[in-house]
Amino acid sequence: MVTKTLSIVFVASEVDGLIKSGGLADVAKALPKSLKELGHSVQIVMPAYKTIAGRDDAEIILTTQLEHWPHTAYQVRSLNVDGIPVFAIESGDYFERAEMYAENNQAYADNGERFAFFSAATLDLLPKLLNKKPDIIHVNDWHTGLIPYLLKKRYVENEFYHQTRSVLSIHNAVFKGIFHYDEIACLSEFKSHFVPEASISHTHVSMLKAGVQCADKINAVSPNYAKELLTELGSHGMASDFQDRESDLIGILNGCDYSEWNPEKDSYIPKQFKVNRISMVRGKKACKAALQQELSLPQKDVAMYGMVCRLTNQKGIQYLLPILEQFLKNDLQLVIVGTGDPVLATRLTEIAQEHSDKFAFVEAYDNKLAHWVEAGSDFFIMPSEFEPCGLNQIYSMAYGTLPIVREVGGLKDSVNNYDDDIENATGFSFKNPEPMELLLVLMRSLLLYSQNLNEVKRVQLHAMKQDFCWNKAALKYIEMYRTAINS
């Protein structure tokens, strides 16, 4: 039987290669690329933010009107990222701004209206630009959560969308897109202040809830995160909504872009290395020495711990700080790179000054340095409060750096704990959100390093052999798409 080629429209608020603020952008670039490589037709739709509209290669291909909207005119610019066609929706009223979502840590007051417009315009433009009706419209997070709702309500009898199914990916359920009804009353469906699919009170709606209630299929970005979304803690208050859709909820672990994170080809790191023991040992030794020199740490062959993250409680800094000075009493070195909460940054700076022979803190996001940390460290610390998928643990394994993680979200799915399965181990993990539990697992890793370095090297090489390529994840998405189409 010939398997049908799917027509997929991937809708996201950001796409790496064009504009990025977080992991959503990575997925929005990598997944469509893999879907295309597997033979499917893929288009991306996103907003034409100021930096995108100003690009020389962003050609205007459509100027049109959005019916029943106060600011009716919009344009569509055509670009491509990694060979995938991109339709970027341009509206001076909504997207001609310095940033995507906020300025000076203050969300734009009209974000509800902006992304309601984006959702409505997406469904308006597709019949005007596509020759082939889409089989799947794949939307992401709250910014696009109204698209499944509008498909079910506004377009339920529209011939172009008659066979189209929607999929919603949840990258982080903390952000729900909560707005007053009046803020999105430009959509006629919301003028009545009664939309049960989206309502969270008599005055407010959640765009994410609308997507969860109306999408044909929902996926979380790891299997364990899908389970966590069924709980009040894991869903941040939306458990009943996810429980209503449990039969349509699936977890698919994000892939890794090995074109960027590959020690054999990495142009950032001081010495490239291959997936064999001799090359790995030599390469990591050279990268560690270069990292030490770069950060003015003593040139010593001691256990090197790395951490690259936003300085927020989500990333588990609150578990590390209480035990950090106790941990630094041991013969080791630690590098932390990141920006975020100034209070956390100040405390890390103080500790780094007190322990300058062991601990370097760099308050910045430096992509080159991030690669150096991944390559030069022996262990990588990720004690997250929650982590829907996580990527640094996957990058770490690719570089033979053993992740030390809390067993949440995708961290639990991707890291095999040494103390649970020595033979197949790829790192270390702990369960409870307690500083002392983190200290115990850190000391466990340090003990192994000091007593059995050969065993550490064996586990590091095994970690390097793990395969989290995007094509494997894309096959699972295709299976989900076909289930949605056939349901």
UniProtKB/Swiss-Prot annotation:
Keywords for the protein's UniProt record, in alphabetical order? Glycogen biosynthesis, Glycosyltransferase, Transferase
Statement: the UniProt record of this protein carries the keyword Transferase = yes
Query: Which InterPro entries does its entry note?
Result: Glyco_trans_1, GS/SS, Starch_synth_cat_dom
Q: Which residues bind ADP-alpha-D-glucose?
A: 20
Its annotated pathway reads:
Glycan biosynthesis; glycogen biosynthesis
One GO CC term, this protein? cytosol
**Entry's Gene Ontology BP terms:** glycogen biosynthetic process
Catalysed reactions, as listed in the record: [(1->4)-alpha-D-glucosyl](n) + ADP-alpha-D-glucose = [(1->4)-alpha-D-glucosyl](n+1) + ADP + H(+)
* EC numbers: 2.4.1.21
Q: Does the keyword Glycosyltransferase feature in the UniProt annotation?
A: yes
Its domain of life? Bacteria
Protein family membership: Belongs to the glycosyltransferase 1 family. Bacterial/plant glycogen synthase subfamily.
- Function recorded in the entry: Synthesizes alpha-1,4-glucan chains using ADP-glucose.
Q: PANTHER family recorded for this chain?
A: ALPHA AMYLASE DOMAIN-CONTAINING PROTEIN (PTHR45825:SF11), GRANULE-BOUND STARCH SYNTHASE 1, CHLOROPLASTIC/AMYLOPLASTIC (PTHR45825)
Q: Protein name, please?
A: Glycogen synthase
Source organism (scientific name): Aliivibrio fischeri (strain ATCC 700601 / ES114) (Vibrio fischeri)
